[in-house]
Structure formats: C-alpha cells, structure tokens
C-alpha cells in the first residue's frame, strides 16, 4: 500500500512514539523510509520603529545555527539507533532554517513519498491557537495521507 514513507521527528518524547510507529510500519510494509527533522531559523524581531527591534550579529546567527545542527544530529542519531535496533533501513535528513510544516510537505513531495508519519502534542484551545500545530498544517497543506500518532495518555 505505502512504499515511500516520510517520518518526522523533533526529538521530543511525543515524537519518539511517532518514530516507533513509523519504523514499525516501514518495516512491515518493506517501504523506503526517510526520517526528517527540521530546525527553524533564528527568530528576529525587526521591531516597529524606535529601538524596539533586535537584529542578531553574524556570530549569534552562527552560534544558533551550530546549536541547531548539533541538536538535529542528536535527534537523527537517536532515530538511527531505533531503526538499527529493529533492523529497518532509513535515510536521515536535517532541513535547517525552515518552517517545519512547510519543509515536511515539500520534502514529501520532492521525494515522492506516499505517506507522512508524525506525532502530535495534542494541544487544545488557546494553547493550540497561539502555539499552532505543525501536524495541522501538514494535514491541510500536504497532498498525501498523514498518519498522526497521538500523545500517549
């Protein structure tokens, strides 16, 4: 049924459940698997005038990018260890300086994936409104089915 799966993780405990499900599904279906983690660009406040804005120095940008790269490396190393433990082959991808939902949708499209697997934190009410939901954005903007793994009870 599914032959090319994109599995998204941010390294959180909730995402780990998504990784477990995605790995098991890819193994059961003998599907090609890409595991992706996305790190966002350094948030910059250009302000609305006067001296309210903050623009980072190049050193701050470089430091942030290095920290994101290190974090993404750990996230993907953890996913790699989980894949090796159950004998599932995968490709591993870090997309830096990107909006997660957009990067997930674009990667699924460019790699010809026919399923996206991701976990959701299950935020509700105002928390969801203000914090947003990458999963919701992928569901709305994606063109392939999305398997959503809920936060464990």
Task: Show where each model-derived region lies.
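Structural beta-alpha unit
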Residues: 1, 77-116
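Small/aliphatic-rich secondary-structure junction motif
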Residues: 3-58, 82-91
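Short, well-ordered secondary-structure micro-motifs
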Residues: 18, 45-49, 102-105, 128-130
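Short glycine-rich anion-binding loops that position phosphate/pyrophosphate groups of nucleotides
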Residues: 41, 109, 121-124
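Short, hinge-like loop/turn segments at secondary-structure boundaries
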Residues: 50-54, 108-111, 134-135
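A short acidic, glycine-rich active-site loop
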Residues: 55-74
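Glycine-rich, Arg-bearing micro-motifs that act as flexible, cationic patches
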Residues: 115-140
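Short, flexible loop segments at boundaries between secondary-structure elements
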Residues: 144-152
